[in-house]
Amino acid sequence: MNAITFKATCCCGACSITVNGPPAINALCHCAHCKRRTGSAFGWSAYFPNASVTATIGAFRTYSVPSKVPGEENLQERVFCGTCGTTLFWRSRDFAGLIGIAGGCIADPVLPEPSITVMNEERCAWLTFVIVGAGATG
């Protein structure tokens, strides 16, 4: 049986990342960083093992999200299209060995429904949907 392949593409199509296999974590996040990264009320993040990345194509740029604690390593390194600015993926110190991919950038096949919501204490008060069967943390 062949493993499922997911491909995330930026808005202009110049950059992409391809991974094999299902995500290790598939979550909605309500933290301020994800809200700012997406320009939305939450971020959809699919985390895959680093070894599952099979291809990255395009002229990427990076932005390092600094820690608020002096001398501490950066929180995240975000990787985005150098042409249109779409954030496609990132590496986070909190998820060693995993690469986070923006769920909304994956078109076909469609990612399964997120199974968890995190940082719920920062969720917008008007946002009332519930993920059926999902665990909720923080």
Q: Model features per residue range: what roles?
A:
Residues 1-9, 14-138:
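A short Gly-Trp-Pro
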